[in-house]
Amino acid sequence: MKLLYGTGNPAKLDAMRHRLAGLGIELIGLKDLGGVKQPEIIEDGKTPLENARKKAEAYFNARHMPVCSGDSGLYFDNVAEDDQPGVHVRTVNGKYLSDEEMTAHYAALAEKYGGLTGRYKNAVSLILDADHRYDAMDPSMESAPFRMVSTPHPMSKNGFPLDR
């Protein structure tokens, strides 16, 4: 089965291809569609699931093929609501952050709170056809808790600057 993974992030596409290896699924990304114009999607949901659904529906309606989209939110323990990234992990005060800007922002946040314990809450939305839609977001899909400190590790993965 050919399945469109609704992301423009090559690191996320590679990670999902690895997870699906051996299942008989040909996972393609948005860039694999060539120069076809993609719908503009404003990820303004309040939860990862709302954003995952929004992306899956937009890509399904535009491409008329099976689509899987995901979204994540980053949540820290004992951090003020104003400082919680939630679904806006890469966007701070309306600005989309580069990998380097993300590293600096979260290092400063860790400094402010004396270190952070966080986790990613993840959601997926799968649309096979008009009659078969599946959504999931529950605690079993969350990342393991992790610790973030103000001094970044020198090694990082392109596209995943906080995963060091």
Q: Which residues does each predicted region cover?
A:
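Anionic-ligand binding patches
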Residues: 2-4, 10-164
